[in-house]
Amino acid sequence: MKTINELQDEVIEEFSDFDDWMDKYQLLIDLGNEQEPFDEKYKTEQNLIDGCQSRVWLQADLVDGKVIFQAESDALIVKGIITLLIKVVSGHTPDEILDSDLYFIEKIGLKEHLSPTRSNGLLAMVKQMRMYALAFKTKMEG
């Protein structure tokens, strides 16, 4: 399995193929549409991420010591953003997730091309993923 940094570098490479942000937004939408279907049973208040303008549900499970994320959003670009985050961090250990520096967000210019509310939502998604990783780490050590 590739490291988080190797996966981030792949994302940076994929986005560097496009100069126009309309093309990059389309790539995000396409990524969201390619995502595995989200099980309706996980669309609960508990799985909703606070701080997002649109509704985003994030489900996490610990499988063989690795955190597996699934997500859904009612907004196409946001669904693409959460899919991108999942592509990079899902399938790694809690420690790997907690120790990661998600530099790809800056490198592809994502944060600066989002509205302030979407940018806050992005930060909320990352924070929630780290919270799940921390909870699983604590559970494994406990």
Describe each PLM feature range.
Residues 9, 79-80, 98-99:
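A generic alpha-helix surface/boundary motif
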Residues 82-92:
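Alpha-helical support elements that line or immediately flank enzyme active sites
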Residues 73-75:
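A short interface-forming secondary-structure element
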